Structures are given as structure tokens and as C-alpha cells.
Amino acid sequence: MINENIFRAYDIRGKADEDLNDSIIRKIGIVLSKKILKTGQNKVYLGTDCRLSANRIKKSLISGLCSNDLEVLDLGMVPTPLVYFATKIGKTNCGIMITGSHNPKEDNGLKMVINDGAVSGFEIKNDVINLKNKTTNIVNISDARDLIEQYENEIFSNCKLPKKIKVVLDSGNGAAGP
């Protein structure tokens, strides 16, 4: 049974081990892969934050995404803006970030971009709920961590300070980078 409340206006969010179980995440991946392929794209960037449930969700999501021959460009553990950056300068303008954002540690979710536009959980809700299970063993993953250095260079090139200052960083439970 799918908790329909996980489908939100700007993302998908819920209790990682209950609402976002492997079966549901896989279905979401299948639906997103179809949506991406309809735009003429055949790749998607994928990043995760540092939550304990991220790798399990990633594995199930990749299974669903690859079920329709979509190539997953794996960014690894990165801050959310890096996924958006990748969709602007990389090999595709589609990306998914597995992140619980500011929510409690038991939660997790997905932020999705297709053709430079945010994907609402509402947009895919009915397709996910009505999807019949489809099995496949095809996995097509490429390492895309080379974009991390480009992202860092872009950030540093836009930060010109007139003098040396002390900086404190609070990543807010996110993946703040190296």
C-alpha cells in the first residue's frame, strides 16, 4: 500500500523505511525513467545526501530507472545544488537528488528535475500508484563524480573576498563536500 501523502508539490518525502520502501522507490524510478525518455533524454544524474537510508533508496531507484534502458550518471554523495549544477552543464538536463533535506533523520525523499524543470510528486503520483511490477536485471550506471571539481571551481570563481576572513560552515545534516 502506498502512502499517497509522500507525493508533494515539489518533491517526494516520507518515512524512509515505511513510506519509501524498495518496491515503492523502484516504481517511482520506473515512472521517472518513462517520463525522462519521453523528452528525448536517455540519461539522468543521481546524487544522495548522507542519510543512512540513502544507499538503500539509491539501489532501488537505480533498478527502476534502468528498467527502461536509462543511463544513471552517479554523482555519489553530494550537496543538492550540485545535482542542479550537473543538469545545467552536464550530459543531460535531468537529475534526481535523494535527500531528506531539513526533515527528521527517519525521513528521506527525492527532488527531481526533468528538462530543467522541477517535477512535482503530484505529477507522477497516479502513474506510480497504478504501475504493475516490472522485473529487470539491467543496470546502466556511469560515474559522474568528475563534475564535483567543476562545481567547486564554479563556486570558488564566484567568491572573491577583499580580505581573508574566518568562515564557519554548518551543513545542516547535508553533504557539504570534501
Give residue spans per PLM region.
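Ferredoxin-reductase
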Residues: 33, 40-115
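Surface-exposed loop/turn and secondary-structure junction residues enriched for glycine/proline
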Residues: 9-19, 23, 78-81, 86, ...
